[in-house]
């Protein structure tokens, strides 16, 4: 059927139209996810519950908002509105390069 788009194509179309992406990690999940990489490489803001994301070299509070509460309060909603109005900061290309598939593949093959 020609009306059915491949999953990736549909996701990419939605990401391009979005100002910000939302990532909710499961309890115990650590590390960065595909959603984080999508935000980085499509130059989108990210709202996440991944507290450890602050430890990564690409973290910038203008670009990534970390939800600390399990229950979102009115204060959190105000903070998110403020975050969405902040100007997104460009991430250095050398930092981004470290999160490409090619870089990871070379790193794995060289170890």
Predicted regions and their residues:
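Non-catalytic N-terminal targeting/anchoring module and adjacent flexible stem/linker
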Residues: 110-111
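Donor nucleotide-activated moiety binding/catalytic core segment of transferases
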Residues: 1-42, 51-52, 56-62, 67-103
């Amino acid at each position: 059927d020609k009306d059915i788009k491949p999953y990736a194509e549909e996701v990419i179309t939605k990401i391009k139209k979005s100002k910000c992406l939302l990532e909710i990690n499961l309890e115990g999940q650590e590390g960065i996810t595909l959603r984080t990489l999508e935000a980085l490489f499509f130059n989108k803001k990210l709202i996440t519950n991944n507290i450890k994301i602050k430890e990564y070299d690409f973290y910038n509070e203008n670009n990534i908002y970390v939800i600390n509460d399990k229950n979102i309060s009115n204060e959190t909603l105000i903070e998110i509105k403020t975050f969405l109005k902040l100007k997104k900061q460009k991430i250095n290309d050398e930092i981004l390069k470290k999160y490409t598939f090619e870089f990871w593949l070379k790193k794995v093959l060289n170890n």
